[in-house]
């Protein structure tokens, strides 16, 4: 895992490289694009705020936070990963059915899942059990 904010670092990485940034209680996951916007490396993601697919400059994605470079998932070539990502342009965002983690995994052709969603569901279930136990 690499932490970076420097543009020269991210231009060396292939399109489809997975990046993440903390947004409060969750981490927003995206991929480096093959494009530039305003001279910056672009990032593609699936965002609740955008209602789905968004391609934006790296600095907008980062929101002043440190970006963690996760690496490259799967074995599909970058051009195929980007094609698969762009196929989801018209799909609506859904926290439970197709969020940023689902999007990245779909694009890479690996099992589609959301580890953060699974963790939150587990914690919610645990809190429910504790609340019931406290009433007894």
What function would you assign to each model-found segment?
Residues 3-69:
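Glycine-rich catalytic cores of cysteine/serine-nucleophile enzymes that process amide/ester linkages
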Residues 1-5, 76-77:
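N-terminal start-of-chain detector that recognizes signal peptides
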Residues 55-60, 72-100:
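Catalytic toxin/effector domains delivered as secreted proteins or via bacterial secretion systems
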Residues 87-136:
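Activation targets extended, charge/polar-rich intrinsically disordered C-terminal tails
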Residues 27, 45-47, 78, 106, ...:
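A general secondary-structure boundary signal
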């Amino acid at each position: 895992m690499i932490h970076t904010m420097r543009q020269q670092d991210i231009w060396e990485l292939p399109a489809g490289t997975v990046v993440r940034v903390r947004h409060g209680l969750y981490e927003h996951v995206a991929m480096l694009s093959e494009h530039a916007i305003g001279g910056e490396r672009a990032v593609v993601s699936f965002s609740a705020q955008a209602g789905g697919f968004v391609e934006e400059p790296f600095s907008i994605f980062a929101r002043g936070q440190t970006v963690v470079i996760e690496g490259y998932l799967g074995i599909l070539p970058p051009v195929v990963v980007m094609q698969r990502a762009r196929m989801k342009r018209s799909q609506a965002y859904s926290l439970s059915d197709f969020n940023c983690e689902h999007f990245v995994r779909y694009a890479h052709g690996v099992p589609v899942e959301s580890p953060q969603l699974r963790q939150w569901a587990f914690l919610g279930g645990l809190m429910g059990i504790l609340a019931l136990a406290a009433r007894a």
